[in-house]
Amino acid sequence: DTIEGKLPQKKIVREAARGYSSYGNQIGLATGYVKEVYHPDYVAKRMEIGAVMGAAPRRAVQRLTSDPGDKIILLGGRTGRDGIGGATGSSKAHNTQSTSVCGAEVQKGNAPTERKLQRLFRREEVSHIIKKCNDFGAGGVSVAIGELADGLRVQLDKVPKKYAGLDGTELAISESQERMAVVVSPSDVKTFLGYAAEE
């Protein structure tokens, strides 16, 4: 049954599956795992869980520490206002009017860029020069880069933007699923950028 002020369960299930499948198809990955969770605590809408798993040979993965003088490179999609507040938005109480307000908090997907990142990170010659990396999920630059080193200097004016007019706070907190921050040694910057340009 549909609770007053909430979207119908049938619409949620169909649209969630359609969106998940569409994005997976665009990046060339099989979306093989989707699960619906039925529980009294999910009475307004059932929980939909989807996952795509990645694997790499152990020799291609390293976990190193960042050292003074190392460089952090941002790559992938550009920053915009569409990714501001996504993490907090997912925790809000929603109703039928939420889509007109909360849609702006969710970063607009860019599947071709995501696919390029996947191809780049699959190359062992690339992964071997990455000391650490992080994605731009919840929290954007402020979290993704903040977790990479104990102390650092971030130049927000160098963050690639979708358009002009973004202030420092917007640049710092905008989220994206198609951006990564990588730590490389200064001597590897040119090599890494060359590999990235090939994608």
Q: Where do the language-model regions lie?
A:
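Glycine/proline-enriched, intrinsically flexible loops and inter-domain linkers
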Residues: D1-E199
